[in-house]
Regions:
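A short, Lys/Arg-rich alpha-helix, primarily the initiator
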Residues: 1-19
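Helix-turn-helix/winged-helix DNA-binding modules
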Residues: 2, 16, 42-45, 56
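Recognition helix of helix-turn-helix/homeodomain-like DNA-binding domains
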Residues: 29-44
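DNA major-groove recognition helix of helix-turn-helix/homeodomain DNA-binding modules
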Residues: 48-63
């Protein structure tokens, strides 16, 4: 599992969610600035934040982590 793949896939999924940065931030309890950093592949979320993102946005954690191709 490579950080680059995780960052790229998470960024892609956040952009495709149809939600604004502020909406995502409110849903998972982080600042909009943190979501911006995830969207721009500058930073990875902590594990608990990653879990919240996956649950709130119905994301496939296995895909984001590079364990599956789609």
């Amino acid at each position: 599992m490579e950080n680059t793949i995780i960052k790229e896939r998470l960024s892609e999924e956040l952009k495709n969610s149809g939600l604004t940065t502020i909406e995502i931030a409110k849903r998972i309890g982080v600042s909009p600035e943190m979501i911006t950093q995830y969207r721009t592949t500058k930073k990875l979320p902590k594990l608990d934040t990653f879990a919240k993102l996956c649950m709130e946005l119905d994301l496939d954690a296995n895909y984001i982590l590079g364990l599956t191709k789609n």
